[in-house]
Amino acid sequence: MHSHILPKTMPNWTQKFGYGKFIHLEPNADGSANMMQGGQFFRRIVENCWDEQLRIEEYKPFHTQVQVVCTIPVMFSYWAQTADALELSRFLNDHIAELVQRYPKNYIGLATIPMQDAEAAILELERAKSIGHVGIQIGSNINDENLSEEKFFPIFEACERLGMAVMIHPWQMMGFDSMKKYWLPWLVGMPAETSRAACSLIFGGVLERLPNLRVCFSHAGGSFLPTLGRIEHGFNCRPDLVAIDNPYNPRTYLGKFWVDSITHDIDALEYILKMQGSKRV
């Protein structure tokens, strides 16, 4: 399964770039830190978010051999100007690459790239591979555009060419402004976002055009696998709406992508294993 990590310190990007609500850290007296989005509190994090040795000690009791580490999705900054997002991506990617170099038996790194600009994204993708990253983590949508949009295809094509895996993580959740109560964007929106990404890549023909592209959908694929029957039914009964870019049944793609095992429920995990097979989880 994946996990998130940040450097212990980082620049105040909002002050440096002069706009936006970039994330920066404000340390607390108890050793924790506040993630600040511009000038607003976003989340409190504790030492295991940046202390690599503490993380190793924490996962030892679970007999975990290695952690896949990547940034926290709010750091993506796809809304930012390309040059600034690229600088931020390089900073985060260098941090993870250095971590993996120090602990090669304990960590595997996934990079972040400025998806809002394909040329810059591919340049950083190539650089990330050269410094030891084995893949990238990207959002479930890019500034509310689906991953099936043709502008993103060259990035996926480069990932296939370079052998760089793609882990898709939900972010910028649909319905965020209309269901803030009860933390629903994370509880309801996140699984839906992951299914949105899976459906987009399948129905948009990206997985068909790039059969060697290695894609992993986080959080066990979100709501995609549990609702595959409904998705397939829609494909069969309304091909005029669903099968307009790819004529193949979405069920045929089972086993052609990966999901991680983060279900928080043993029965759900057993269902995912039944659907995907253990080698794709």
Regions found by a protein language model. Give the residues of each.
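Helix-coil boundary/capping segments in enzymes
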Residues: 1-281
